[in-house]
UniProtKB/Swiss-Prot annotation:
Catalyses which reaction(s): UDP-N-acetyl-alpha-D-muramoyl-L-alanyl-gamma-D-glutamyl-meso-2,6-diaminopimeloyl-D-alanyl-D-alanine + di-trans,octa-cis-undecaprenyl phosphate = di-trans,octa-cis-undecaprenyl diphospho-N-acetyl-alpha-D-muramoyl-L-alanyl-D-glutamyl-meso-2,6-diaminopimeloyl-D-alanyl-D-alanine + UMP
Subcellular location as annotated: Cell membrane
Record's protein name: Phospho-N-acetylmuramoyl-pentapeptide-transferase
Family per similarity comment: Belongs to the glycosyltransferase 4 family. MraY subfamily.
Length: 325
């Protein structure tokens, strides 16, 4: 498979997002699908209230346009490609329902945590059944080494934890203009390189499609954002990156490449644990990006800094996965 196919998929998904976004944004405004802003959030965010949300639909559509091109013209519809499409669409649907309820209720509360968890578990179960059907092994490799271990039936628990953890971690990161679109494109770009070097061609192409879709969406999501991706986009991306890590047998690499998402999640865990145990908060606000806003950083400065940190994690992951393995 020639490298030009990666460029073709990248350009196709980027173009799809760039073309569809300006058509979709007025449609969202007409339907009054505006974002509700939490009252307890940073005061500077109140002016964003009403900004069109559910832009993740554009991201998912752009990914699927490219995925269809991959399936029809490049690799065929392999089981791995179909599983990636199912997980991305499934988590995107859960996010869509959540976003829709928020818009209809005019409040930043959509699905309950139990309802969202149930939806995520159903998709995880479907994914696991799909893995069993293709004879997927349960061996875990330690990045950068020749060591590993077989989890056996415990692999099911790992899959559930990865899909739930990644989807929620990515969702937490979507709090500033361009933050998730930028860090996400970096992480998926890294996985595209890792998958390609490991011979997982269809997964590499799918990762590239997501990278292109996010870069195209970033044109309209960068500060000041004209549209937000909402849970439709963030949950789809979280599910996708976990599925990619699993299918490429780079489960532990997700912690490195997705380092920004891990840090954001840890900041929330630390904040909640500290407040419950001591009654004091470690950060001004969590997730971490809000803390930096409240200490005086501009939104754009926070976003660019997180992009740079994401690049460092991505470079580390590619170095370990390609050159040390």
């Amino acid at each position: 498979m020639e490298e030009w196919t990666l460029l073709f998929v990248l350009i196709l998904s980027f173009a799809a997002a760039v073309i569809m976004s300006p058509l979709f944004i007025p449609f969202l405004r007409k339907l009054k699908f505006g974002q509700s802003i939490r009252e307890e959030g940073p005061k500077s965010h109140q002016k964003k209230s009403g900004t069109p949300t559910m832009g993740g639909i554009v991201i998912v559509l752009s990914i699927f346009i490219s995925a269809l091109a991959i399936g029809i013209a490049i690799t065929g519809f392999t089981p791995e490609l179909l599983l990636l499409m199912v997980v991305t669409l499934g988590y995107g649907i859960v996010g869509f329902v959540d976003d829709y309820l928020k818009v209809v209720r005019k409040h930043n509360l959509g699905l309950t945590s139990k309802q969202k968890l149930a939806g995520q578990l159903v998709i995880a179960a479907i994914f696991y059944i799909g893995l069993l059907a293709i004879g997927f092994d349960t061996f875990i490799a330690i990045p950068g080494t020749t060591f590993g271990f077989d989890l056996g039936w415990l692999y099911l628990i790992l899959i559930v934890l990865m899909l739930l953890g990644a989807s929620n971690a990515v969702n937490l990161t979507d709090g500033l203009d361009g933050l998730l679109a930028g860090t996400g494109s970096i992480a998926f770009g890294a996985f595209a390189i890792l998958a390609w070097s490991g011979g997982f061609i269809d997964t590499a192409l799918f990762s590239t499609a997501i990278t292109g879709a996010l870069l195209g969406f970033l044109v309209f999501n960068a500060h000041p954002a004209k549209v937000f991706m909402g849970d439709t986009g963030s949950l789809a991306l979280g599910g996708a990156i976990a599925a990619i890590a699993i299918l490429t047998k780079m489960e532990l690499m997700l912690i490195i490449v997705g380092g920004v998402f891990v840090i954001e999640t840890l900041s929330v865990i630390i904040q909640v644990a500290s407040f419950k145990l001591t009654g004091k908060r470690v950060f001004r606000m969590s997730p971490l990006h809000h803390h930096y806003e409240l200490v005086g950083w501009s939104e754009w400065r926070v976003v660019v800094t997180f992009w740079l940190v994401g690049m460092i994690f991505a470079i580390m992951g590619v170095y370990i996965g390609v050159w040390l393995t």
